[in-house]
Amino acid sequence: MTVTALGVPTVRGRSEGSAIASDAPGDGPLLDRFGRSATDLRVSLTDRCNLRCGYCMPAEGLNWLPGEQLLGPAELARLLRIAVTRLGITSVRFTGGEPLLARHLEEVVAAAAQLRPRPEISLTTNGVGLAKRAAALAEAGLDRVNVSLDTVDRAHFAAITRRDRLTDVLDGLAGARAAGLTPVKVNAVLDPETGRQDVVELLRFCLEQGYQLRVIEQMPLDAGHQWRRNALLGSDDVLAALQPHFRLRPDPAPRGSAPAELWLVDAGPDTPAGKFGVIASVSHAFCSTCDRTRLTADGQVRSCLFSTEETDLRGLLRAGAGDEAIEAAWRSAMWAKPAGHGINNPDFVQPQRPMSAIGG
């Protein structure tokens, strides 16, 4: 069995357990040096997953983070409090790996829901196991979910995820809708070979079920570093595949800092109208309006999905640092955020961590 190393980038502040000095403002919004304000926090709860999508993980053999390196629920609750009350975070999304594999998920959601001002709380999940927990998550304070689903073709699903779990995901979507975790959004990363066919049926399915589809361009975040720009199924390809089957027009509502470009969809008299979005992270990057900050399952702040440096908050927590020191380290990390991800630059270097160990 081939074992793929997880890979950890350069970590700032790991050894000394103290905040890193910078020119970052000491209070107010969580700014970077280009004037962007981070209000959206992505929190990874685990690097483990029960699917094995090829664009994210190898078929087998990925080393997991040791359990003692992962943040516990009390540590997560404290960092959430600092983020919301001191850094101005207004939206918290829990991710993985697969966050439903984190036993303390409901506890952490409840901790976020108790904060004032209360942030919007959402979850990105593969949907396996969601049907059984959707009601409890809603009771804990979860507002809505995004479910990753790349196709509604069972054979294609099994080929992409290396698991035959499509029925479980569909049940999870229905469970989320029944629990009021709406709008239920579907995140799709399209396979270069089957995606043009899959996206037509996937959009039709989402319109019929009342879900909102988001098609996400595949990014260079796979564990095997096999991503190639010339194999990308980009946003223009997606629209070209859909236009023969649906009437599409741009959503006139202001986009703001949202990553998705939204389209209004008319599918004809037999299918409800709706909307869908395309997140063109590669072909039409939106880095200039990015409002995200990221916390990995092992307590590292990443200013960008494609960062090559991380700032260690777990070390600060476990060294007994006060809220002020943790806040300062977080602000320093975000102040150093690059202008863009650089995917289309000839000198681009893929992050050492795969997506499963960063959080989407």
UniProtKB/Swiss-Prot annotation:
S-adenosyl-L-methionine binds at Y55, G97, S148, M219. [4Fe-4S] cluster 1 binds at C49, C53, C56. It catalyses: GTP + AH2 + S-adenosyl-L-methionine = (8S)-3',8-cyclo-7,8-dihydroguanosine 5'-triphosphate + 5'-deoxyadenosine + L-methionine + A + H(+). Belongs to the radical SAM superfamily. MoaA family. The gene is moaA. SUPFAM superfamilies: Radical SAM enzymes. Residues 33-251 form the Radical SAM core domain. [4Fe-4S] cluster 2 binds at C287, C290, C304. Monomer and homodimer. GO terms for molecular function: 4 iron, 4 sulfur cluster binding; cyclic pyranopterin monophosphate synthase activity; GTP 3',8'-cyclase activity; GTP binding; metal ion binding; S-adenosyl-L-methionine binding. This is GTP 3',8-cyclase. Pathway: Cofactor biosynthesis; molybdopterin biosynthesis. Catalyzes the cyclization of GTP to (8S)-3',8-cyclo-7,8-dihydroguanosine 5'-triphosphate. GO terms for biological process: Mo-molybdopterin cofactor biosynthetic process. It holds the Pfam family Radical_SAM. The keyword 4Fe-4S applies. Its cofactor is [4Fe-4S] cluster. Keywords: 4Fe-4S, GTP-binding, Iron, Iron-sulfur, Lyase, Metal-binding, Molybdenum cofactor biosynthesis, Nucleotide-binding, S-adenosyl-L-methionine. NCBIfam families: moaA.
